């Protein structure tokens, strides 16, 4: 059985597919850049656009398309010459836990994992539709891949209505019930440690380069109402940290929870184990992130 924490510690580049709803918020943009600026740890095979639906989109399909365009924009800011394949993902969520939603992204995930001579790490930071669809289309990829997903809240949290998970509950059920080795980065109760502020972002990034200026403006705009003492969790970077800086994540191996139809956790100690991240070391992770961004 693959010892994921030990594999992650190895100082070699990992083959990575990044699945992102890049236009949903502002944290995906930081994460795409962080991955591209960490070539000693990350070899990006592809970036896939995930669906989302909130005030920044009119439908899951619109959210996916906006994310696709935002991915291209960020890749261009980091390195205009970068040759990273980018794929459109699902236009809707899974109808149930048995039927995939086929897309260019899901097909690319299947192909890239099957073609690889090494373990492929799928880092998913949005609704899990593309990855769940790939697993339904080709269950064999679970033997050659590891999934790192930022989704769900901490196991002790009073509810599990977390954005990424709650959008596609059948998709979450697919991945938690599958055989793919899984690392879960919970949101509330764990990622809430990874917080920053506009003054901190401006201090380290403002004026450094076009990418940094874009990230500063994104962060400022997210507090459009000018709320005092405002802070922002840059959630998604913690998922890429599993590949880039695993020393900043406290991981434990426990039985996988069951995802109920109401998105709650249920427990069966006989279930396959997975890796659960229970703590983020905020300061060294931000130090690494800011250093790489300002040197872009």
How should these model regions be labeled?
Residues 82-88:
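Ligand-binding beta-strand-loop-alpha-helix segment within the catalytic cores
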Residues 51, 88-90, 258:
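A general secondary-structure junction signal
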Residues 90-95, 222-226:
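Short glycine/proline- and acidic residue-enriched helix-loop micro-motifs
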Residues 68-71, 106, 237:
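A general structural signal for well-ordered alpha-helical segments in protein cores
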Residues 1-14, 27-44, 166-173, 185-296:
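Conformational coupling and interaction surfaces
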Residues 78-82, 180-181:
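Structural alpha-beta junctions
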Residues 2-65, 92-198, 281:
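Active-site histidine-anchored catalytic micro-motif
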Residues 62-79:
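Short, structured active-site "lid" loops
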């Amino acid at each position: 059985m693959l010892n994921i924490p030990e594999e992650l510690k190895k100082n070699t580049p990992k083959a990575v597919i990044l699945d992102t709803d890049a236009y949903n918020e502002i944290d995906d943009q930081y994460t795409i850049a962080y991955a591209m600026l960490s070539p000693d740890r990350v070899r990006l095979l592809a970036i896939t656009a995930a669906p989302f639906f909130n005030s920044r989109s009119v439908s899951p399909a619109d959210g996916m398309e906006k994310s696709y365009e935002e991915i291209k924009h960020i890749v261009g800011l980091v390195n205009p010459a970068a040759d990273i394949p980018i794929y459109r993902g699902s236009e809707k969520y899974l109808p149930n836990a048995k039927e995939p939603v086929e897309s260019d992204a899901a097909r690319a995930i299947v192909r890239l994992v099957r073609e690889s001579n090494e373990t492929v790490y799928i880092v998913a930071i949005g609704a899990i539709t593309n990855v769940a669809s790939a697993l339904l289309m080709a269950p064999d990829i679970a033997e050659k891949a590891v999934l790192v997903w930022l989704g769900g809240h901490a196991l002790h949290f009073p509810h599990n209505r977390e954005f990424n998970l709650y959008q596609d509950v059948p998709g979450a059920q697919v991945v938690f019930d599958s055989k793919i080795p899984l690392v879960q980065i919970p949101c509330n109760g764990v990622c809430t440690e990874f917080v920053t502020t506009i003054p901190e972002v401006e201090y380290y990034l403002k004026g450094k380069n076009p990418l940094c200026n874009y990230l500063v403006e994104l962060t400022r705009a997210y507090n459009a109402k000018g709320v005092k003492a405002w802070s922002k969790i840059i959630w998604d970077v913690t998922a890429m940290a599993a590949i880039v800086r695993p020393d900043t994540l406290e991981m434990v191996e426990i039985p996988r929870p069951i995802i109920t139809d109401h998105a709650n956790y249920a427990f069966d100690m006989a279930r396959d184990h997975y890796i659960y991240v229970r703590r983020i070391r905020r300061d060294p992770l931000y130090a690494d992130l800011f250093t790489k961004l300002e040197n872009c």
